[in-house]
């Protein structure tokens, strides 16, 4: 699997911003089939930083209604990546 297929997008929420500032931990949406080792290698290769830890969880999609039609958003996988002390990704600065 290509490293750019593993990492889909950053998750920018109030909680993820606090984790970034306090624990040097970033949150990404990743491919559901990717494991922790693949995620760590992809982050290290794309952003050129040292990864200490990867934690993952599967987020269930919400049920949404539009009139009588009931639908469901897709499930997705979230990865919380802890970087080495002193390592930062400039992409997230100012967010």
UniProtKB/Swiss-Prot annotation:
Example of a GO MF term: rRNA binding
Keywords: Ribonucleoprotein, Ribosomal protein, RNA-binding, rRNA-binding
One GO CC annotation: ribosome
Gene Ontology biological process terms, A to Z: translation
Domain of life: Bacteria
Task of the protein: One of the early assembly proteins it binds 23S rRNA. One of the proteins that surrounds the polypeptide exit tunnel on the outside of the ribosome. Forms the main docking site for trigger factor binding to the ribosome.
Quaternary structure and interacting proteins, as annotated: Part of the 50S ribosomal subunit. Contacts protein L29, and trigger factor when it is bound to the ribosome.
NCBIfam families on file: PRK05738.1-3, PRK05738.2-4, PRK05738.3-2
Family: Belongs to the universal ribosomal protein uL23 family.
Name of the featured protein: Large ribosomal subunit protein uL23
Organism: Desulfatibacillum aliphaticivorans
Organism lineage string: Bacteria, Pseudomonadati, Thermodesulfobacteriota, Desulfobacteria, Desulfobacterales
Primary gene name: rplW
């Amino acid at each position: 699997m290509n490293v750019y297929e593993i990492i889909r997008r950053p998750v920018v929420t109030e909680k993820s911003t606090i984790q970034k500032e306090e624990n040097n931990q970033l949150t990404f949406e990743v491919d559901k089939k990717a494991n922790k080792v693949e995620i760590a290698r992809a982050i290290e290769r794309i952003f050129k930083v040292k990864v200490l830890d990867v934690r993952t969880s599967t987020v269930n999609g919400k049920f949404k209604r539009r009139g009588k039609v009931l639908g469901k958003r897709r499930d997705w996988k979230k990865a919380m990546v802890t970087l080495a002390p002193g390592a930062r990704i400039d992409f997230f600065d100012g967010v």
